[in-house]
Amino acid sequence: MVRFISLNISVTALLLFSFRTHLTTAASTNTCVVAKDSSDDAITIAKAFEDCKTDGTVVFSKNTTYSLKSVLELSGLQNVNVDLAGTIELPARNTSYSTTSAFIHFEGSNINLYDALDHTAPPTILVSANDSSFGSFRIVNAPRAHMRIKNSNNILVHNVTFHTASSNICYLPKNTDALQITQSSNIVFKDSYLTVGDDCTAINGGVTNVTVSNIICNGGHGFSVGSLGKGGSTDVVRQVRVRDSTCNGCENGVRIKTWPGGQGSVSDVNYNNIILNNVDNPILVTTHYCDPNVIEYCNSNDTISLTISDVHFKDITGSVSALGNPVVNINCSSLTPCSDFTLSGVDITRVTTTSNNVCENLNGSSDISVCS
């Protein structure tokens, strides 16, 4: 087991923890307190992990900031507890890190972490693990996505605070998704507070059985499934539950987005008891998603995309912004229409400029009251 306690990361650039072994639980027999270094704290951090890499505890002292000038790669750890009571300050922006897989990479099994403007940057934390939990930590001012779960099973993320915002409208915190999930199953994300510049959740291809609950997200792009099917690729997502959560001032509220020309399916998706306050696009399902930063992928066959079915919106309340967008916008492809949708308890306060709801290429739309 690798156990992390009291993690407080002030993100300005790059840090990489790489755990490459499968780890088992054992009592700690040695404690190594990370010392400060006059030039680069990565040196003393590496030494502490080397000295306590088997059945040890590595301690980052409380009220201490550790400044890194280089990348850390920590491997060969067995049964290590990590008490991150201090703050890790990552290196200054450096484009040479743009191809790095993550700032912090946890790879292994039974990992437990507790109490704890570069748009080409990798995510801050990458999890590739099984039967692991990550909770009660903060990430502040991430340069890109805060956390990504990939090739994982049975992961719990809880009681986290992600805060990335900008006071300068010319430098918006783009691509700062809170939690990205891909090629994974049995994921729970709950009891967390987010301020981000992109998706509050991004549930991507190859994902099964995700539960998101009791999340407050501010200023983000909503609780999203996708994007999926980019460049004609095949993606499958099923069994998604998003409930008892809030989006404040978000661009989108609850959203499913697939690219034109994509293949695969989205099914068994439930949004339940969601509060959307001053949201531009409260309920949005589109098979015509386009990212202008990669416009070459926007020109595929717009009549087909992933099939989206068995999707249910229940008790979605709040208010729409003054931009004039519809409360409900379901816009599917003509040759792969959406089907088996229900919308009940939708109570979003409109403004005078709010457009009529859209339900295009949705089978059974005549039986859905918000579509008429």
Swiss-Prot record:
Active-site residues (renumbered): D198, H221
GO molecular function: galacturan 1,4-alpha-galacturonidase activity; polygalacturonase activity; rhamnogalacturonan alpha-L-rhamnopyranosyl-(1->4)-alpha-D-galactopyranosyluronide lyase activity
Cross-referenced Pfam families: Glyco_hydro_28
Localization of this protein: Secreted
Family assignment from sequence similarity: Belongs to the glycosyl hydrolase 28 family.
Chain positions carrying an annotated carbohydrate: N8, N63, N94, N130, N159, N209, N301, N331, N363
Domain of life the protein comes from: Eukaryota
Signal sequence range: 1-26
InterPro entries: Glyco_hydro_28, PbH1, Pectin_lyas_fold, Pectin_lyase_fold/virulence
Protein name, per record: Exopolygalacturonase rpg14
Stated role: Specific in hydrolyzing the terminal glycosidic bond of polygalacturonic acid and oligogalacturonates.
Comment on pH dependence: Optimum pH is 4.0.
Modification after translation: N-glycosylated.
Disulfide bonds: C200-C217, C332-C338
Temperature curve summary: Optimum temperature is 30 degrees Celsius.
UniProt EC number: 3.2.1.67
Gene Ontology biological-process entries: cell wall organization; pectin catabolic process
Keywords for the protein's UniProt record, in alphabetical order: Cell wall biogenesis/degradation, Disulfide bond, Glycoprotein, Glycosidase, Hydrolase, Repeat, Secreted, Signal
PbH1 repeats: 152-183, 184-205, 207-227, 237-258, 303-350
GO cellular component, one term: extracellular region
Catalytic activity annotation: [(1->4)-alpha-D-galacturonosyl](n) + H2O = alpha-D-galacturonate + [(1->4)-alpha-D-galacturonosyl](n-1)
